[in-house]
Design a protein with these regions (language model features):
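C-terminal helical/coil "lid" or tail adjacent to the Rossmann-like core of SAM-dependent
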Residues: 70-80, 257-315
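A short glycine-rich, Lys/Arg-flanked "PGG" loop and its adjoining helix->strand segment in the class I
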Residues: 189-201
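Core SAM-dependent methyltransferase catalytic element
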Residues: 251-254, 320-327
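A short SAM/SAH-binding and catalytic strip from SAM-dependent methyltransferases
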Residues: 174-187
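A short acidic, Gly/Pro-enriched loop at the edge of an enzyme's catalytic core
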Residues: 164-175
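Conserved alpha-helix/loop element of class I SAM-dependent methyltransferases that forms part
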Residues: 89-106, 123
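Conserved catalytic/acceptor-binding region of the Class I
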Residues: 88, 206-270, 285
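Class I SAM-dependent methyltransferase SAM/SAH-binding core
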Residues: 109-111, 117-165
Length: 327
């Protein structure tokens, strides 16, 4: 056993830490309780029944609890450029095989919803070089950041807008794409409905979202239990991936294809950086919601950094679920 493998966040406040660790099973169970049971309806879908072009639809109801949580985690995408780049390094190799299922010749106009700093928009532009790509982002500062880091690349531009209230006309894009947006969204069903509305008949709406059911490494380390604990307490929809298929089906696509992938990192250390940077970005949330004693949190980050630098550690990322739907 490696010297640090049997310890995690043990300095200073053992009693409080044991209390925090004791709460983890209940917290994870509570998060799992949001998973749909057979015959029940997701709160994300309430009020969204009917066709994708139901009259007057611009968005939909917001679950108050999810809206509050979303405000806590939104900063993850705003000020952490390094994390966003590492996230792209983790997810691009998993996303591109999904995009390869779509015939390139049929794609000339693409909408990238929740584009953040523009990493996914640039990925789409590279994969579909003959298409024009529009990145849609709510935060004006991120729109400016994305544009500045894209330069004068032909066929790529960014605009400010609300993902749950897409302003574009019906059937105006060949491909509508989103990645890791619904997990943050206060109303993911409104986003999905809007995606199918603005995709043309025969076009494609593609979502790629996490199902953060487990985070683990080998050899196993107790730090990852705390990572899973925080992930399931801080994000609005940490397991939205498992709800994607029923959510898309609610809006009656003509065709739907879905699958799941699990990433593994044994030599680059990129997943280790991804977990550590995410937990660092959650610092204000941990403090504001008192999810963990601050010295325990600092010890967790330090342990994640040490684990990240261990060349013997193999990371297995939680599953990601993808859906390709056609209106």
């Amino acid at each position: 056993m490696r010297p640090h493998a049997a310890r995690c966040c043990v300095r200073g406040t053992g009693r409080r830490l044991r209390k925090s660790l004791g709460e983890i099973p209940q917290a994870v169970a509570a998060a799992r309780g949001r998973t749909l049971s057979p015959g029940t309806e997701s709160p994300c879908l309430q009020g969204h029944q009917g066709g994708i072009r139901a009259s007057g639809l611009v968005g939909g109801p917001v679950c108050d609890r999810y809206e509050t949580l979303n405000l806590m985690t939104y900063a993850l995408a705003e000020d952490n450029a390094e994390r966003q780049q590492v996230l792209a390094e983790c997810l691009d190799p998993l996303t591109l095989p999904v995009l390869q299922r779509i015939p390139k010749a049929s794609i000339t106009r693409i909408l990238d919803i929740g584009c953040g700093q523009g990493n996914t928009t640039r990925m789409l532009a590279e994969h579909f070089p003959d298409a024009s790509v529009t990145g849609l982002e709510y935060d004006p500062a991120l729109v400016a950041h994305a544009a500045a880091h894209t330069g004068n690349r032909s066929g790529v531009h960014f605009e400010q807008g609300d993902a749950s209230r897409i302003s574009h006309s019906d059937a105006s894009f060949d491909l509508v794409f989103t990645r890791y947006l619904l997990t943050h969204s206060p109303d993911p069903a409104a986003v999905v409905r809007g995606m199918l509305r603005v995709a043309r008949p025969g076009g494609y709406a593609v979502a790629f979202e996490p199902d953060a059911s487990i985070d683990y490494c080998y050899p196993p380390h107790p730090c990852m239990d705390l990572v899973n604990y925080l992930w399931n307490r801080a994000f609005p929809h940490p397991r939205i991936g498992r709800e994607l298929v029923p959510m898309f089906r609610t809006f009656g696509p003509s065709r739907l294809e879905a699958g799941a992938v699990i990433g593994m990192d044994h030599d680059r250390g990129v997943y280790g950086r991804f977990y550590r940077l995410t937990i660092e970005a959650l610092g204000p949330v941990v403090e504001d919601r008192n999810l963990m004693a601050q010295d325990d949190y600092a010890a967790l980050v330090a342990d994640l950094r040490r684990l990240e630098d261990d060349p013997q550690t193999i990371y297995f990322k939680f599953p990601d679920v993808w859906v390709i739907a056609q209106p």
